[in-house]
């Protein structure tokens, strides 16, 4: 299973990361830094549907999405279009991401930034804060019975978080824990197939006072209008923007249709 491979390799990578920079070192650095914290949760609480635009070079299911990948250029484009937050892939092996992307994008983009990675260790939460992330992704399928502990740690660190769920059991767990932002992934992490109706199916297990983010398989303005019509608060769009990032006119038309009709 792809997810198992990613998690295994992430744990191996963390062994090296901790040798290079220990948790104590990170905590010490955090105590001496005045970090620019942006309110990710607030960006998703608008009357109209909010859009989180993603920056990623590759994915396990699609391979390299953009050969001419330039995170700074993409960050500048995202600064000047009608989106509400930015998601940045930092996973190295499968998505070809880097921690450094958050810092360099934050220099050219004023919107809240989500660190998109596979969190398996609390070390990564402290690391996320150090590298300038405003929010992190917590994947229920990865954390399982550790989800509540990790969610509480994000609160202590002043980080927002999206708790990602893929099935009824995970949706109920995230709701019971009290997770304020719940991401429903329309992609099945077992085989990476997608079905946008997954969001509607799982929403009924999430209390109405939570922020719901729909992730994956969102390709058209009509997809966004459909999701808004069923009560979704925000959508995360990655590949669709990455493949069309040079067509600024097309992206603006996409966003106008998605938001102006909402």
From Swiss-Prot:
It catalyses: 1-(2-carboxyphenylamino)-1-deoxy-D-ribulose 5-phosphate + H(+) = (1S,2R)-1-C-(indol-3-yl)glycerol 3-phosphate + CO2 + H2O. It is an enzyme of class 4 (lyase). GO terms for molecular function: indole-3-glycerol-phosphate synthase activity; phosphoribosylanthranilate isomerase activity. PROSITE patterns: IGPS (PS00614). One of its GO terms (biological process) is L-tryptophan biosynthetic process. Pathway: Amino-acid biosynthesis; L-tryptophan biosynthesis; L-tryptophan from chorismate: step 4/5. SUPFAM superfamilies: Ribulose-phoshate binding barrel (SSF51366). Keywords: Amino-acid biosynthesis, Aromatic amino acid biosynthesis, Decarboxylase, Lyase, Tryptophan biosynthesis. It holds the Pfam family IGPS. Its EC number is 4.1.1.48. Belongs to the TrpC family. This is Indole-3-glycerol phosphate synthase. The gene is trpC.
